[in-house]
């Protein structure tokens, strides 16, 4: 078995999907969790305005609505949270996403004060925080906020991790990589687009250039530039297709370099890192 085969098996990506079937798989997955743990009454998710949070958010809202219909329990809610750092340049995209998702509850929590407070405290301790490191603080502050909201709403936090993101480790450890459930896991980028199209999303949502937008010195830096490889190549790779040796080498290098992000904290019983 090649490394590509091993990765595809671990990620669970199918070479061809039926968008309607995959929508049902994700919705049922979320509902099954609520049925298993009846004390959980909400799903919480940060909404950026990009493809991934738009898709996960809409799937969560559908699951919650079906749970209310099936159980007659009106306490089930989906909570969408806008988590801007100051004034976000793509706020229009976020509002477009919220209009598509139609969440039960929509909150906005500006993380700038919390992030700047943390950076100031580190500066006082003699630590000069780099722009890249500060970007990770932003991602982790967003997850702190989501868990705080989930605690108030008896909720579980959803993540937006999917195959194209997971394979490259393109997420912040214990930031956007921290969540309770991952409804998009097994789907690559183009498959996520197909689900959004099936759900009737505005094409602007899934045609938007993907960006983490965490670094102030590189605002709106496209994921593909940061990774040095295109999502088209990543998607082809996860579907078992042949891609250029250069792209393949980059993808597999990212996979190996970021293995620690795909595991719980390492103990003496773990050997994946050796």
UniProtKB/Swiss-Prot annotation:
EC number: 6.3.1.5
Segment forming the signal sequence: none
Single GO MF descriptor: NAD+ synthase activity
Residues bound to deamido-NAD(+): 140, 173, 180, 260-261
Transmembrane region(s): none
Entry GO terms, CC: cytoplasm
Keywords: ATP-binding, Ligase, Magnesium, Metal-binding, NAD, Nucleotide-binding
Record has ATP-binding as a keyword: yes
Binding site for Mg(2+): 52, 165
Domain of life: Bacteria
Gene3D superfamilies: HUPs (3.40.50.620)
Catalysed reactions, as listed in the record: deamido-NAD(+) + NH4(+) + ATP = AMP + diphosphate + NAD(+) + H(+)
Pathway: Cofactor biosynthesis; NAD(+) biosynthesis; NAD(+) from deamido-NAD(+) (ammonia route): step 1/1
InterPro entries documented for this protein: NAD/GMP_synthase, NAD_synthase, NH(3)-dep_NAD(+)_synth, Rossmann-like_a/b/a_fold
Residues reported to bind ATP: 46-53, 160, 189, 211
Swiss-Prot/TrEMBL GO biological process terms: NAD biosynthetic process
Subunit structure: Homodimer.
Role, per record: Catalyzes the ATP-dependent amidation of deamido-NAD to form NAD. Uses ammonia as a nitrogen source.
NCBIfam families: nadE, PRK00768.1
Family: Belongs to the NAD synthetase family.
Protein name: NH(3)-dependent NAD(+) synthetase
Gene that produces this protein: nadE
């Amino acid at each position: 078995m090649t490394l590509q085969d091993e990765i595809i098996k671990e990620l669970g990506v199918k070479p061809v999907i039926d968008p309607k079937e995959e929508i049902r798989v994700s919705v049922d997955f979320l509902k099954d969790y609520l049925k298993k743990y009846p004390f959980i009454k909400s799903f919480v998710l940060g909404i950026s305005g990009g493809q991934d949070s738009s898709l996960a958010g809409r799937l969560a809202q559908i699951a919650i609505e079906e749970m209310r219909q099936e159980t007659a329990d009106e306490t089930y809610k989906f909570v969408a949270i806008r988590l801007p750092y100051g004034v976000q340049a793509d706020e229009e995209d976020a509002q477009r996403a919220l209009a598509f998702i139609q969440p039960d509850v929509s909150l906005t929590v500006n993380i700038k004060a919390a992030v700047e407070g943390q950076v100031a405290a580190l500066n006082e301790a003699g630590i000069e925080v780099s722009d890249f490191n500060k970007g990770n603080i932003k991602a982790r502050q967003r997850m702190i906020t989501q868990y705080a909201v989930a605690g108030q709403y008896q909720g579980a936090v959803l993540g937006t991790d999917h195959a194209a993101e997971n394979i490259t480790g393109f997420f912040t450890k214990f930031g956007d990589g921290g969540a309770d459930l991952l409804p998009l896991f097994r789907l690559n980028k183009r498959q996520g687009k197909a689900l959004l199209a099936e759900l009737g999303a505005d094409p602007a949502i899934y045609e938007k250039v993907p960006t983490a937008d965490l670094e102030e010195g590189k605002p709106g830096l496209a994921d593909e530039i940061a990774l040095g490889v295109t999502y088209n190549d990543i998607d082809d790779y996860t579907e078992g297709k042949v891609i250029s040796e250069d792209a393949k080498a980059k993808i597999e290098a990212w996979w190996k370099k970021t293995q620690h992000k795909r595991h719980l904290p390492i103990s003496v019983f773990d050997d994946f890192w050796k």
